[in-house]
A protein has these predicted regions:
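Short acidic-aromatic low-complexity motifs
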Residues: 1-26
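A solvent-exposed, acidic/Ser-Thr-rich amphipathic alpha-helical stretch
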Residues: 17-70
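Short beta-strand segments enriched in hydrophobic/aromatic residues
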Residues: 24, 77-79, 111
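Residue-level signal for well-ordered, solvent-exposed loop/turn and beta-edge residues enriched
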Residues: 29, 85, 102-103
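Hydrophobic/aromatic beta-strand elements that line small-molecule binding cavities or substrate pockets
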Residues: 44, 57-63, 77, 90-97
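Short, cysteine-centered beta-strand-loop-beta hairpins and adjacent loop/turn segments enriched
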Residues: 53, 78-88
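Short, well-ordered beta-strand segments in beta-rich or mixed alpha/beta enzyme
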Residues: 70-77
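Short beta-strand edge/turn micro-motifs at domain boundaries
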Residues: 90-125
Length: 125
């Protein structure tokens, strides 16, 4: 699970929706407190369309010890928007994996939206 998490975060950082989607089961989705629930392609494309540069510093990836296949990535997101504004925030992404294929089913993002909203507002195209 950890390799898939790191591959996804790398694809997100690069704004590569196709690479990100290749890690998911068909119909895979991302739930963002800012953007709501979107297909993985739509989510990565939306973030990339507002970005000029992104850098993720991964603090830790935690893997479930029992029950559903799950991992949590805890990282710092340094995000530069196309208008030149910048925002930095900590994020915890909860990854749910398909037990048959080992691919990602969904990701639920957890972060404080207040500093993000203050900078991003409605700069998504």
């Amino acid at each position: 699970m950890q390799p898939a998490v790191h591959k996804y975060l790398s694809a997100l950082e690069a704004g590569d929706a196709e690479r990100a989607a290749s890690l998911f089961v068909p119909g895979g989705w991302v739930q963002s407190p800012f953007l709501g629930r979107l297909s993985v392609r739509d989510y990565v494309n939306k973030v990339a369309s507002a970005s000029s540069k992104a850098h993720l510093t991964v603090y830790d990836v935690l893997v479930s010890a029992e029950g559903h296949l799950r991992a949590v990535a805890y990282y710092q997101y340094d995000w530069s928007l196309k208008d030149g504004s910048n925002v930095t925030f900590d994020c915890a992404d909860v990854f749910n994996f398909d037990s048959d294929t080992g691919r990602i089913e969904s990701i639920v993002l957890v972060y404080d939206t207040d500093p993000v909203r203050a900078v991003v507002q409605n700069k998504y195209p």
